[in-house]
Amino acid sequence: MDVSSSTVQLNTSDGKMDAYVAQPKDGGNYPGIVVIQEAFGVNDHIKKVTERLAAEGYVAIAPDIFHREAERLIPYSDMSKAIATLQRVQDPKAMEDVGAAIAHLKSQKNVKSDAIGVIGFCMGGRLTYLTAAHHASDIKAAVPYYGGGIPAGNPSPLSRTGEIKCPMYLFFGAKDQLIPMDQVGQINTELTTKKVPFQMKIYPEAGHGFNCDDRGSYHEASAKDAWEKTKSFFAQHLK
């Protein structure tokens, strides 16, 4: 499916926020998906994910969660700066940003306003989990990839699990040095206890960031399998 892309500006309480939008060129009505960035910004990888979703028949939008920062793009080689920047991200502000992206999708004539999902990676994986709770009335499917720190924060995304209404598919790597397996077990237990419909896949050979082919941690077999599962999951719950 041919895709067109553009950058739009959305209003937040802290001023304008850029958001990258990719959508099918063909007319018609499509489900919408919010794409939440890694701790490196809305870079080429995140734009590529947004475009891949559009090619599958979605209107996808990636809000720039770093729009309050002087530097909104951080190279993969500068992990210390990425960590420092993500630590300044406040959950309520990030949820406002995601809310603006959801509102934009719902305002578009080619978007099915009752079929909106969310996907995110790394920092965005954690925020995807939080979005499923915070924006529960809008989100119909959520896919967090290697979301670190889900039990962290006050309140933590994990503590809001009971608010989640949509099905989830969570992806982790067993060799992820940033997300210990006991944390993954904690998430599994809480989702089960709160009766959230979910699937979880842990790839034994994958580490953190395994989906990103611009990073040294890219693990092709795991990434391809996760993407096929992601496509099927969104098609099942949004189309």
Locate each region found by the language model.
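N-terminal cap/leader regions of alpha/beta-hydrolase-fold enzymes
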Residues: 1-239
